[in-house]
Structures are given as C-alpha cells and as structure tokens.
Amino acid sequence: MASVELSADVPISPQDTWDHVSELSELGEWLVIHEGWRSELPDQLGEGVQIVGVARAMGMRNRVTWRVTKWDPPHEVAMTGSGKGGTKYGVTLTVRPTKGGSALGLRLELGGRALFGPLGSAAARAVKGDVEKSLKQFAELYG
C-alpha cells in the first residue's frame, strides 16, 4: 500500500480545526482525493458509520464505500474505503494543539491489486503530492 503522512501548522484553534476536519460536507473543498458524496451524510459520526463517495487518485475516479474506523473527537478520525477493482483507501486526520494554533496531520493510503510493481512507486509519489496539496488548501481556506 502506498502511504504518506504529513502535517501542517494552521493558525486556528484545535477546536476550530477539528470542526472543519469533522464536517464531511466541507471535505471536498480541501481534500484533493475527495470528489463528493453519493450517499446521505449521517447526522452524527462514529465508529462503524458507512458513507459512499467518489475518490480520485492518479487521475482515476472510483466509487468508494468508506467506513469510519476511529472516532476520537477532537483529536482523530480515520476511515478506510473499498472501491471498484479491489482498490483500498485509508484516510487518517489528526489535530493537536501547537503554540500558534494547531497542527493538522493527514495520512493517506492507497492500495489494491492494481498498485503492485512500478505503478506502486508512481502511486506513492502521487499520494505525497495529494497530501501536500490537501494540507496547503486546508491552511489557505481556514487559516
């Protein structure tokens, strides 16, 4: 599985950062791989909640069934996803306080049969670019 984990400092409080991170309707505004939801968003999130969305990775769109695997407000939310063709996704968002506001951590994982061999290293590079761009967009949008 190709995975990258990076963080960025944002000049807003940890609670404000969490409020944006946990607002699923805002996810497409800053998370590069997220194109939109195809199911109703739940009124309340928690472990085990499932949501259907569309993800874009390496230029390919895929319908993904996401499941919340960790829900620890206001610190961490993690989701795993399964898409068509055996693709696997993982997204973990963390928020921690810093002296100047908060740090947003983003771990993005991409895997499945299609990503073995040379395509796997290309996927790792693409995932790193997506994580960097997502963190930058979050900071620009909300910071």
Swiss-Prot record:
Cellular component GO terms, alphabetical: plasma membrane
Entries under CDD domains matching the protein: SRPBCC
One Pfam family cited in the UniProt record for this chain: Polyketide_cyc2
Protein name, per record: Uncharacterized protein Rv1546
